[in-house]
């Protein structure tokens, strides 16, 4: 007998707080991507994102335009919803995930007709370690 267990994705309960600049359009588009993937998102406009990133401990080399927090994890930049879901399912002993910069055609950075920028989703830890969590090519 083979038994399969289907676990509800954690997206239904996951509350995401997204810190962003008020004028950032791609930050709002990323929030829309998360909402389309069943997350509840609260956008919080911040005047000095650099100070918010410092407060949360986002490494300089991983920074992007917006910084979110979900279930104690930091999500920096245009991280795809599926990688957030994976993070919440696996619950690694990590500080968070990041997509450094603003890769074209990553979630929230869609540009019709433009080629996709390859990018990595990086998992980062309190001790400073950083590893590739997923790659998009």
Q: Which residues does each PLM region occupy?
A:
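Hydrophobic membrane-insertion alpha-helices, especially the h-region
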Residues: 1-4
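Local sequence-structure signature of Cys/Sec-based thiol-disulfide redox active-site neighborhoods
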Residues: 9-37
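Short active-site oxyanion
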Residues: 15-16, 39-41, 71-74
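Active-site-proximal beta-strand/loop segments in catalytic clefts of secreted hydrolases
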Residues: 19-21, 44-46, 78, 100-102
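Stable alpha-helical elements in mature extracytoplasmic
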Residues: 23, 30, 45-48, 80-84
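Conserved helix-turn-beta segment immediately C-terminal to the redox Cys motif
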Residues: 31-51
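Thiol/selenol-based redox catalytic cores and closely related redox-interacting motifs
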Residues: 55-137
